[in-house]
Amino acid sequence: KIANGSGSEQDIAEAKI
């Protein structure tokens, strides 16, 4: 996933899984 403005850290963490 590409990180959105809000909650970007969570999106990046999910993408690394």
From Swiss-Prot:
Family: Belongs to the ATPase epsilon chain family.
Physiological role: Mitochondrial membrane ATP synthase (F(1)F(0) ATP synthase or Complex V) produces ATP from ADP in the presence of a proton gradient across the membrane which is generated by electron transport complexes of the respiratory chain. F-type ATPases consist of two structural domains, F(1) - containing the extramembraneous catalytic core, and F(0) - containing the membrane proton channel, linked together by a central stalk and a peripheral stalk. During catalysis, ATP turnover in the catalytic domain of F(1) is coupled via a rotary mechanism of the central stalk subunits to proton translocation.
Name assigned to this protein: ATP synthase subunit delta, mitochondrial
Ion transport found in the keyword field: yes
Gene Ontology, cellular component aspect: mitochondrial inner membrane; proton-transporting ATP synthase complex
Organism: Penicillium glabrum
Chief location of this protein within or outside the cell: mitochondrion
Localization per Swiss-Prot or TrEMBL: Mitochondrion; Mitochondrion inner membrane
Subunit structure and binding partners: F-type ATPases have 2 components, CF(1) - the catalytic core - and CF(0) - the membrane proton channel. CF(1) has five subunits: alpha(3), beta(3), gamma(1), delta(1), epsilon(1). CF(0) has three main subunits: a, b and c.
